[in-house]
Amino acid sequence: MTTSDLVAGELAGDGLRDTRPGDTWLADRSWNRPGWTVAELEAAKAGRTISVVLPALDEEDTIGSVIDSISPLVDGLVDELIVLDSGSTDDTEIRAVAAGARVVSREQALPEVPIRPGKGEALWRSLAASRGDIVVFVDSDLINPHPMFVPWLVGPLLTGDGVHLVKSFYRRPLNVGDAGGGAGATGGGRVTELVARPLLAALRPELGCILQPLGGEYAATRELLTSVPFAPGYGVEIGLLVDTFDRLGLDAIAQVNLGVREHRNRPLAELGAMSRQVIATLLSRCGIPDSGVGLTQFVADGPEGQSYTQHTWPVSLADRPPMQAIRPR
């Protein structure tokens, strides 16, 4: 059982004791069983607009079902649904359009700025392509996402005061089929549990109450998103979390239980590269110099391991500036 599972269990009914940093916040800003209805949230919009952004890169197998889970909300709770495509070479765009989403490429979103690779770049550019007062990000590799993911995420922003960022938390199954096993009920979120949460405990312990600091499903005010830099690649979520805390404090952050999140689990080699970027971003946010050296991995060339091939994954320390400096609203 992971740390996140244990904390979720406490929220579900084991009780809270004011003995740990963040316990008061967990009682006030964490929704374990969100009860809002779509109709209630539509009424609470009070003239505010909501954009949902799906960053995508070669997600033809899942993009359609993710869009299908959100599209019934369009022209009601949701004002626009955008797929920000990062250069897919498969049928992601075709299937997204067929499902009813508007697809915007990185080039179209911000044509005057040369492209950089990575997820952080896609999310940053989506701010130029969208118009909502609230922006919801949902990963495109989700499997059978619950149709209430988006309503639950915007709930604290529409019904509360002072909240600017809403993170999600959930149980994360681990599909180990590639290793000859099956699907485990827990065990997903390996970078979160082995890298992000231990580092936050050391460097920003106040954020230890955030169950899924790297989760790709979250909502935020445009005011916040356009005022902070965006970290490159997979550092974008941890960068945004720390920036929000450092600028606005813990009470500007909330979290909502989305139940279960299933997605395409990645091999360890890719998780190593992801971890390297998360570490670089968190160190930089905490004022600790990073070497800027990429992660070198050694892969056995055969079952006997008699020789190894080196592969180095690059790491980036270059943030994108706040969008309001590029596109003042």
From Swiss-Prot:
| Catalysis performed (reactions) | an NDP-alpha-D-glucose + (2R)-3-phosphoglycerate = (2R)-2-O-(alpha-D-glucopyranosyl)-3-phospho-glycerate + a ribonucleoside 5'-diphosphate + H(+); (2R)-3-phosphoglycerate + UDP-alpha-D-glucose = (2R)-2-O-(alpha-D-glucopyranosyl)-3-phospho-glycerate + UDP + H(+); GDP-D-glucose + (2R)-3-phosphoglycerate = (2R)-2-O-(alpha-D-glucopyranosyl)-3-phospho-glycerate + GDP + H(+)
Q: A GO molecular-function term, please?
A: glycosyltransferase activity
Question: Where does the UniProt annotation place the signal sequence?
Answer: none
Please tell me where (2R)-3-phosphoglycerate binds in this chain.
G189, R190, V191, T192, N265
Q: Which Pfam families match?
A: Glycos_transf_2
**EC number(s) stated in the UniProt entry for this protein:** 2.4.1.266
Oligomeric form and interacting partners: Homodimer.
Q: What does this protein do?
A: Involved in the biosynthesis of 6-O-methylglucose lipopolysaccarides (MGLPs). Catalyzes the transfer of the glucose moiety from UDP-alpha-D-glucose (UDP-Glc) to the position 2 of 3-phospho-D-glycerate (3-PGA) to form glucosyl-3-phosphoglycerate (GPG). To a lesser extent can also use GDP-Glc but not UDP-Gal or UDP-GlcNAc as the sugar donor.
| Name assigned to this protein | Glucosyl-3-phosphoglycerate synthase
